[in-house]
């Protein structure tokens, strides 16, 4: 696959200026870059707010290819994890050099953080391009292959043409979770979340491509040769 694509991204830095470390944040399936910076409850659940305001990191959130304000593509043959890995690599190269964007900053280190499918992309980036990152954080991530099937089944994915909130935003071929039960099953542990957050996740949910869902395992199945720092955060049952 080859082509020209546009990525929608948001850069944040402390009031005092750029942090020495840039965190590049990659969201999972069913979300966009706002996953990392929700304004609900006065930004109480915003990762970006904590990272920037309290710990003085710079952050870069982006809509993965095929999602939100980034370029769309063929949802089966084009928008797969392999293209997403390359997109994250190019975004990282741009961020490191500062060329091609209006940010006057240079960073001592770049750390990549992922959620769910975003963690699979982050893991694969570190394995494929180990020099592109100084450390990775994987949340909602597992190398147990059985969970891929559970995710696909629990997601209750239907064509976007059957979801009024998404049908006007995505071309035919994309899919989305049909109801709150699906999102609850895949992302919210019973009794451990604010119910209003589940409602927000449904209202602001985004679509996915079948190509992504079918290639999730490619980002997690093999051993990783990356020798830098790794933090893995995955909830139990």
Regions found by a protein language model. Name each.
Residues 1-18:
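N-terminal cap/lid segment of alpha/beta-hydrolase-fold proteins
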Residues 16-56, 60:
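Short, surface-exposed "cap/lid" segments of acyl-processing enzymes
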Residues 25-31, 115-116, 235-236:
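Glycine-rich His-Gly loop
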Residues 29, 63-67, 142:
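Short beta-to-alpha linker loops that shape the active-site pocket of alpha/beta-hydrolase fold enzymes
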Residues 34-35, 63-78:
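Glycine-rich "HGGG/HGxG" loop immediately N-terminal to the catalytic nucleophile
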Residues 77-104:
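Alpha/beta-hydrolase active-site loop
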Residues 108-144:
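Conserved hydrolase catalytic core segment
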Residues 151-237:
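Alpha/beta-hydrolase
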